[in-house]
Amino acid sequence: EQLTVQVDRPATILIPTMAGVRVSSDKGLTALLVAVLVMCGGRLAAASNLVPAVYVFGDSTVDVGMNVTLPLPYGIDLPHDFLPTGRVSNGYNLADYISRQLGFKNSPPPYLSLTPHTSHQILRGLGGVSYASGGSGILNNTLIMETSISLAEQVKFFADTKLQMTQYARGKDSGAALDELLAESLFLISAGGNDFFLHIANPDSSDSIFQENLLSNFTKHVQTLYDLGARRFGIVGVPPVGCVPAVRVRVPFGLCLPHANKIVREFNSMVGEMMANFSTDPEQPGSGMTYSVGSSYNVLMNFTRDPTANGFTVVRRACCGDGLLGAENPCKHNSTVCRNRATHLYWDFAHSTQATAEKGAAIIFNAPVEENFTAPINFQQLVSPRQHGSGGFSSA
């Protein structure tokens, strides 16, 4: 299957959809399991990690196997005991590397694949849960795959987790302890790219109406998480969708699609303004929270414009796939796979390589704000103890 994108020039952009995926069948999640793994896992990890837990929401940029399992060559560079995986990459993804920056081994496990074994790993120090689902979007009708789980549903899953945690924590002062745990945890959100892909492919409204609708829905999700106890938000903005191989392959000379990138930049600015108002206006429900917006757009455009300085040699072509720029046919078991994956920006027609995720996470986490990769603070400052007081958080 392919999505057809009409542009305002003699070109047609074909965005291949995912192939060869299967739905995860292990959905045995019990109230006790969730309560124990989140509460205890976070507490045991607090001594060595920068936050007690990480809760991940979004799309394939941070999905670690919520609803699909991808066959090789996806995950080709992961340890053998890590397979199968739902990461849309040759290896680890952004959620993994941000979690590592926080002191964890990898991203927390996916909500619908928790087992007694994975809960044991969490009890040993990996706190939190991933609700992120590949192919999902901010809008409820943005579902690239039948198994994709919208951001709204992901937030509902967290609400269920919170309820189960509350039921488990019935002791004296348990409510305050739970509030403290959630306030000190990181809520990581990386979503919106698929919404833009579908809008570019088949716009059913003007760009401005689409952006306002997207922002309204995103704001609702942030507010719901805040109402459920989230106080520390790490937002990863929408990447430059106009520069992915699937778009470039149908644009003359393999260039980026300027209009697509323009409306993404505008939306990212809108999100930054919304978060600023949400966190500082005393009349807004989010007063008292702290946040950082990481610009995946600026990070990837920096890699694209100055690849050599960032360790890349190929920034237009997909590492795995066939046809022009490796993007006319999706990555599958018999596809051509590049050998130098560490120097490729893109893994397949629309997703980054492990190398891109690792370098991008390091920049979002550590780069000075003056370099315009994060605002108003970077992720390291977001989880710094000195941010607890300014954001209304208690120290761990």
Model regions and ranges:
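Conserved active-site regions of diverse hydrolases
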Residues: 13-396
